[in-house]
Amino acid sequence: MSREQAFEMLIKILCKTDSTDDMKLILECILTRSEMEDLIDRIRIYNELLNTSNSQREVASKLGVSITKITRGAANLQDNNIKDFLRKKISY
């Protein structure tokens, strides 16, 4: 199986998952604890950047993450399609 085929399979598995318990189980099976923490931090970063007017340095300090991670997240939000999608999916 190629990486592309495996990626498509992963997407199908995730899309077919309809319960939070099943999704949690899948993520725990395929991600290390460190990878899971990185994903969680990204969600926290996007949520903070989308819902506050805090500077990147303030967000980094508040969340206890590096300014590099904040900058990467802010760069992704420059794409309006990504920004609109994330605003609908993760904003509180």
Curated annotation (Swiss-Prot):
Q: Where in the cell is it found?
A: Cytoplasm
Q: Which GO terms describe its biological process?
A: negative regulation of DNA-templated transcription
Could you list this entry's UniProt keywords, alphabetically sorted: Cytoplasm, DNA-binding, Repressor, Transcription, Transcription regulation
Chief place of localization? cytoplasm
Q: Which residues bind DNA?
A: 56-78
User: GO molecular-function annotation terms?
Assistant: DNA-binding transcription factor activity; sequence-specific DNA binding
Query: What residue stretch is flagged as signal peptide?
Result: none
**What is a single cellular component term in the Gene Ontology annotation?**
cytoplasm
Has the keyword Transmembrane helix been applied to this entry? no
Tell me where on the tree of life, at the top rank, the source sits: Bacteria
Which Pfam families does the entry mention?
Trp_repressor
Q: Describe the family membership recorded for this protein in Swiss-Prot or TrEMBL.
A: Belongs to the TrpR family.
The protein's role, per its UniProt record: This protein is an aporepressor. When complexed with L-tryptophan it binds the operator region of the trp operon and prevents the initiation of transcription.
Subunit details for this protein? Answer: Homodimer.
* Family annotation (NCBIfam families): TrpR
Q: What is this protein called?
A: Trp operon repressor homolog
* Species this protein is from: Xylella fastidiosa (strain Temecula1 / ATCC 700964)
- Please name the gene that encodes this protein: trpR
